[in-house]
A protein has these predicted regions:
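Loop/turn elements at helix/coil->beta-strand transitions in domains of secreted/extracellular proteins
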Residues: 18-23, 37-39, 61-65, 90-94, ...
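Short beta-strand segments enriched in small/hydrophobic residues
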Residues: 3, 40-41, 65-73
Length: 224
């Protein structure tokens, strides 16, 4: 099961566990919450770890400073993504994360304002299509498209176009196919043979680059 709302779902999940039903938490929620509820394991993308891996990848590409465009700052997972990226780079998050809001025009304006005030920014990290799409428009308008390092969480039509065009270096795919597939495999083997992986399973981050777009497009809406 997913754990989109801990307050709403924790009771029923705990009741199922108490009745001897084996539970695996997938997609939403956290490994800590899964353990607290007595679930066998968690299969998903830990947000901090995904941000950390993205930051380490960017550091390897020469990035030392960045702008994190946070369009849902009230959610702790969003800040974890930005903090992980900063830690991966080995820098302080500080004021490199902005609360962009969710209005596309406002996001575009705030990104352009930040980059105008901080022209030496090496990279941009967006947290999904909501912030990525307006940010694409911003860097196209200010002439930074293709020059500033650009990575994003999640995939979408405009993000895929940006990767194709070379404006976006990569999109992070949490690989929901694995989130649905692996729990079935784990539970089947657990009930048949009594074997269980010793740790949670991270389904992401999977980094989608221009080289990997063919399969993403082929299976979009089906496996991807």
């Amino acid at each position: 099961t997913t754990l989109a709302d801990y307050d709403v779902l924790s009771g029923p999940i705990r009741a199922a566990v108490d009745q001897g039903i084996d539970v695996i938490i997938m997609n939403s929620g956290t490994p800590e919450q899964a353990r607290e509820l007595g679930a066998l394991m968690y299969v998903g993308q830990p947000e901090y770890d995904a941000g950390l891996a993205a930051g380490q990848r960017a550091k390897g590409d020469g990035v030392a400073s960045f702008l994190c465009v946070n369009h849902y700052i009230s959610s702790p997972s969003s800040t974890q993504r930005c903090q992980g990226f900063a830690d991966g780079l080995g820098v302080e998050l500080g004021n490199q994360m902005i609360d962009s809001g969710q209005d596309p025009a406002e996001i575009k304006n705030r990104v352009m304002a930040y980059l105008s005030a901080n022209p030496d920014t090496d990279a941009i990290l967006t947290l999904g299509p909501t912030s990525a799409d307006p940010t694409l428009l911003a860097v196209e308008e200010n002439g930074m498209a293709g020059d500033i390092y650009f990575g994003t969480f999640d995939l979408g039509d405009e993000i895929v176009k940006g990767i194709k065009a070379g404006t976006i270096a990569w999109g992070i795919d949490q690989q929901p196919f694995l989130q649905a597939y692996l729990p079935v495999v784990v539970l089947t083997n657990y009930h048949r043979y009594g074997v269980l992986p010793g740790n949670n399973i991270n389904s992401g981050p999977g980094f989608v680059t221009a080289d990997g777009l063919e399969l993403v497009e082929k299976y979009a809406g089906e496996y991807r």
